């Protein structure tokens, strides 16, 4: 009866043995120990088979769980989050690159028409011609009008000062063979002529300075002082020549008295001119020996000689008359 019950229990609960029947079957077989080894072998075979089946079933469920986890992770896990982040970054990058790109057709800034008006207008104007003339007529002048001979009239109405337009030309501008630039060539010729004239004037003053006697021979004199001293020196030489002619001709004593009076008047005039505050040579009196004092000494010495000689000559006829 027990064997039948056991044989009936095993086929009836093959799945139940996977949950809780194997420990109870093992307890019955170990407690009673009634049956042959074949029966025990038959009893253990289903357990082993069931054990293997249990293990395989356990592994299968684990595989199913792992596959399900992988599938979940692939479908809605971190991969989906990363994919969404990548899509968001890509969309963000596309937006930034589109924003960073310059606008394709934008109107030119207001400074470009200024440069267009300066250069020769090869492109059509953006505004109608009257409006463009009203906007930029008082600001700049085109290059054609500047290079033409009528540029002087256009400079009066420009916003820029005349010193920017009237620049000093470079030497290479003379080589430009253009009929619209006679003004530049004329300006260069005028500058060279003025420079040559100034050099000639300076050379003439240097030569005149060498002829004027001064106490320090290398004394520095201005152009005004050189001219004043040259005039005085010329007057002194002219008087000296006149006195020599009078001495050779033997004129009357009245002429000698007149010459002496003239000499004293000239000396007084020279002193007043030197002492006047407007004279540029008055500052030279502070020195030890000024050129004017030197020339005045010469004038006084030379003028005193003819006066003395005239007096001596005048005394001779008086003596002759007395003897007669």
Swiss-Prot record:
Cross-referenced PROSITE patterns: BHLH
Positions of the bHLH domain: 185-237
Subcellular location: Nucleus
UniProt keyword Kinase, yes or no: no
Tissue: Expressed in hemopoietic and endothelial lineages. Isoform beta emerges first, expressing in the entire anterior and posterior lateral mesoderm (ALM and PLM respectively), and in the ventral wall of the dorsal aorta, where definitive hemopoiesis begins. Isoform alpha expresses later as two pairs of stripes in the PLM and ALM, and becomes restricted to the intermediate cell mass (ICM) by the 18-somite stage. The ICM is the key site of primitive hemopoiesis, giving rise to the erythroid lineage.
Keyword set, alphabetical order: Angiogenesis, Developmental protein, Differentiation, DNA-binding, Nucleus, Transcription, Transcription regulation
Any one of the GO BP annotations: positive regulation of endothelial cell differentiation
Database matches in InterPro entries: bHLH_dom (IPR011598), HLH_DNA-bd_sf (IPR036638), TAL-like (IPR040238)
Sequence segments annotated as region (Disordered): 1-49, 276-324
Keyword Plastid: no
Gene Ontology cellular-component annotations: nucleus
MF terms in GO: DNA binding; DNA-binding transcription factor activity, RNA polymerase II-specific; protein dimerization activity; RNA polymerase II cis-regulatory region sequence-specific DNA binding; sequence-specific DNA binding
Source superkingdom: Eukaryota
Function: Transcription factor that plays a pivotal role in hemopoietic and endothelial development, acting synergistically with lmo2 and downstream of clo. Specifies mesodermal precursors to a hemangioblast cell fate. Hemangioblasts are bipotential precursors of blood and endothelium, and in the absence of hemopoietic induction cues such as gata1, tal1/scl-lmo2-induced hemangioblasts differentiate into endothelial cells.
Protein name according to UniProt: T-cell acute lymphocytic leukemia protein 1 homolog
Naturally occurring in which organism (per UniProt): Danio rerio
